């Protein structure tokens, strides 16, 4: 024994070392891996992450990337699925507050699933406004939605005898309504604890004063509502979400339990009561209002109450209480009323909110819709006409103002306050309000007078930026600038020819229509252009004044005729060479031959021209445009003179005749060549 103890005592450290190695081996065992967080957990951490949770910005960004990848799972999902998650999150964010939290607790996985849940909850909230009270046993029990299936399976059964209705209940509701003698009232309480809609009602009284246990059923509906609300708040969120989902799922198939409540006695009693039904309904609507703050809608109910006696018993309906009237006649949601802190009463909302809250009430709905005409509070002091808003009244009063200013006494026509109508009114009464002090000419508008006065002052405030030329009117400047830009905004719809000015287009269209609006009063001959008419009228004037009585000298056909014989020379004379012209524009064009001015420049090649027509003819070289088409053979030409020369080949016209031998030619150049044969 001693020898065995010797070595054991001599090697205590070895034993310790063996024990340490054994402990070390235990410590080196790989710990079990932590479970990977779910996508929802990563999503919540991603949204709740704060900058202060990380030691630095780089770590914060890295943590956010990690949480985002844990939420979206790009290695498992496609781009479309990730986009669906982002859209789903934004959709859940913009939902109304009353259903947002409920949908988020159900955690829909796709947008379609979220839309389905929202639609079901909207139907649920709509049905809550159509609750019916069950007065069969003396206590008003509000039954709105079917109960969850889990509670029905775990608790004893209870028996309900469904009343015959037009629609049959769904399979889940039929299972609950299956007659079984083993169900008691305890199952009713257990099912009621999971109904989500009961938590929407505002609790009343002090919950702490009520000492109730899970086995004690409240005696009144008020105690039941407070007890259910308290238990619902302490319930597990997962069970609460599951209960809501089951309620919504069965709600769509079954409708509401109000159609399955044994209410034959109640309905028969209501039919026997007759007129009293409507009286109670109207009284119920009145009691929902605060007498301290009367609203305009009260008169609607009072007026309808007087006409109740004419309603037949067949058209009556069971009395319906508003949600919350079973609990001291209090509105059930903040949208229908708010609590007055001073006296502890719920104030009645405005009239429009009351009408919205009465949508599900058949008896009150007809009363509300009886008088829905908009009120007209804006009265015209002149004619007494009434309007619903102030803007319509102001628009109407402008008619009276226009009648005062613009009533035409002679023709009885009324014009508005627009300057165009005022000027039109002046033409009716012959008024010329604006008179020129220089020549005495009158104008109906001040702008016309200002434009006319520039002819006396010579003012030309509108200057061309390209060539520096000035004009008295802005319209003339715009017309002039087209010579530089080459713009031709006016196009003939018949042949497609384009023009720089609208007047040229109108003149051209007369070729297609054959219109000749200018007619000579002497002989009745018509012309397509006013200039042609002026030239023609000079022939009649020359016949009356030829020969002149003062000098006895006649005028040949080639000399221009002067309507004013006081000046026997042309009105516009060139100061350089003495040549005279009948029009100022011809003199201006002639003076460019002396000055060498070429204001018209080609924007493509830079070549300058003294006349605009030469520039237009030149630009067709660059564009290749041939706007003049022969109607006989379809050939096109860049110049009108070429088309005229070409048309003579079809018509055989020879306008150029030799005075020596009488031979005719189609071109002037050929006549000139022929005349050289006579002169040698």
From Swiss-Prot:
Residues 147-191 are annotated as: Disordered. GO terms for molecular function: DNA-binding transcription repressor activity, RNA polymerase II-specific; transcription cis-regulatory region binding; zinc ion binding. GO terms for biological process: negative regulation of transcription by RNA polymerase II; positive regulation of transcription by RNA polymerase II. The modification Phosphoserine is found at residues 168, 180. Keywords: DNA-binding, Isopeptide bond, Metal-binding, Nucleus, Phosphoprotein, Repeat, Transcription, Transcription regulation, Ubl conjugation, Zinc, Zinc-finger. GO terms for cellular component: nucleus. A zinc finger (C2H2-type) spans 378-400, 434-456, 462-484, 490-512, 518-540, 572-594, 600-622, 628-650, 656-678. It is found in: Nucleus. Residues 43-125 form the SCAN box domain. Expressed in Purkinje cells in the brain (at protein level). Ubiquitinated, leading to proteasomal degradation. Transcription factor that binds to the consensus sequence 5'-TCCTCCC-3' and acts as a transcriptional repressor. Binds to the promoter region of SIX3 and recruits other proteins involved in chromatin modification and transcriptional corepression, resulting in methylation of the promoter and transcriptional repression. Acts as a transcriptional repressor of HS3ST1 and HS3ST3A1 via binding to gene promoter regions. Belongs to the krueppel C2H2-type zinc-finger protein family. Interacts with a number of proteins involved in chromatin modification and transcriptional corepression including DNMT1, DNMT3A, HDAC2, PHF8, TRIM28/KAP1, SETDB1, EZH2, UHRF1, CBX3/HP1-gamma, and CBX5/HP1-alpha; recruits these proteins to the SIX3 promoter region, leading to SIX3 transcriptional repression. Interacts with MAPK3/ERK1 and MAPK1/ERK2. This is Zinc finger protein 263. It comes from Mus musculus.
């Amino acid at each position: 024994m001693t020898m065995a103890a010797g070595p054991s005592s001599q090697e205590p450290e070895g034993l310790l070392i063996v024990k340490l190695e054994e402990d070390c081996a235990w410590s080196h065992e790989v710990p079990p891996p932590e479970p990977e967080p779910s996508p929802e957990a990563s999503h919540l951490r991603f949204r709740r992450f704060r900058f202060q949770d990380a030691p630095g910005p780089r770590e914060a960004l890295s943590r956010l990337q990690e949480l985002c990848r844990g939420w979206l799972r790009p290695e498992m999902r496609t781009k479309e699925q990730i986009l669906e998650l982002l859209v789903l999150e934004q959709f859940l964010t913009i939902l109304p507050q009353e259903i947002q939290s409920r949908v988020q607790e159900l955690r829909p996985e796709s947008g379609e699933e979220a839309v389905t849940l929202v639609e079901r909850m909207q139907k649920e909230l709509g049905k809550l406004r159509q609750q019916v009270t069950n007065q069969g046993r003396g206590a008003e029990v509000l039954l709105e939605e079917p109960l969850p299936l889990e509670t029905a399976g775990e608790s004893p059964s209870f028996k309900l005898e469904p009343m015959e209705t037009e629609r049959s209940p769904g399979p889940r509701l039929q299972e609950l309504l299956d007659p079984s003698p083993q169900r008691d009232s305890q199952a009713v309480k257990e099912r009621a604890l999971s109904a989500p809609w009961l938590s929407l009602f505002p609790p009343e009284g002090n919950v702490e004063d009520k000492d109730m246990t899970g086995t004690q059923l409240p005696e009144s509906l008020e105690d039941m509502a407070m007890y259910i609300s308290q238990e619902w708040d302490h319930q597990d969120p997962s069970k609460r979400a599951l209960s809501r989902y089951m309620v919504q799922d069965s709600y769509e198939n079954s409708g509401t339990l109000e159609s399955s409540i044994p209410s034959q006695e109640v309905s028969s009693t209501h039919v026997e009561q007759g007129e009293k039904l409507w009286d109670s309904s109207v009284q119920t609507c009145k009691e929902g209002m605060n007498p301290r703050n009367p609203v305009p809608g009260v008169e609607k109910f009072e007026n309808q109450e007087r006409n109740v006696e004419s309603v037949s018993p067949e058209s009556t309906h069971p009395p319906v209480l508003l949600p919350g009237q079973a609990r001291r006649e209090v509105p059930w949601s903040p949208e229908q009323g708010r609590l007055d802190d001073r006296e502890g009463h719920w104030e009645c909302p405005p009239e429009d909110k009351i009408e919205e809250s009465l949508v599900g009430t058949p008896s009150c709905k007809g009363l509300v819709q009886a008088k829905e005409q908009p009120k007209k509070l804006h009265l015209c002091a002149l004619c007494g006409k009434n309007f619903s808003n102030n803007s319509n009244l102001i628009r109407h009063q402008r008619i009276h103002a226009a009648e005062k200013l613009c009533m035409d006494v002679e023709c009885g026509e009324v014009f508005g306050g627009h300057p165009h109508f005022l000027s039109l009114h002046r033409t009716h009464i012959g008024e010329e309000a604006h008179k020129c002090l220089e020549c005495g000419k009158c104008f109906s508008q001040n702008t016309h007078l200002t434009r006319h006065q520039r002819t006396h002052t010579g003012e030309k405030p509108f200057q061309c930026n390209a060539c520096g030329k000035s004009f008295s009117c802005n319209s003339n400047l715009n017309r002039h600038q087209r010579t530089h830009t080459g713009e031709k905004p006016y196009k003939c719809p018949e042949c497609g020819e384009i023009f720089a000015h609208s007047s040229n287009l109108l003149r051209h269209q007369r070729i297609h229509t054959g219109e000749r609006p200018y007619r000579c009063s002497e002989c009745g001959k018509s012309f397509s252009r006013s200039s042609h008419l002026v030239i023609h009228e000079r022939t009649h004037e020359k016949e009356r004044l030829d020969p002149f009585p003062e000098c006895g000298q006649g005028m040949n056909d080639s000399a221009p005729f002067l309507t004013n014989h006081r000046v026997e020379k042309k009105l516009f004379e060139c100061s350089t060479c003495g040549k005279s012209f009948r029009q100022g524009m011809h003199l201006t064009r002639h003076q460019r031959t002396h000055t060498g001015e070429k204001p018209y420049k080609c924007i493509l090649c830079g070549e300058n021209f003294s006349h605009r027509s030469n520039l237009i003819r030149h630009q067709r070289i660059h564009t290749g445009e041939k706007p003049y088409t022969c109607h006989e053979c379809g050939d096109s030409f860049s110049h009108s003179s070429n088309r005229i020369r070409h048309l003579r080949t079809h018509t055989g016209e020879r306008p150029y005749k030799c005075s020596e031998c009488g031979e005719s030619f189609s071109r002037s150049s050929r006549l000139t060549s022929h005349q050289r044969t006579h002169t040698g």
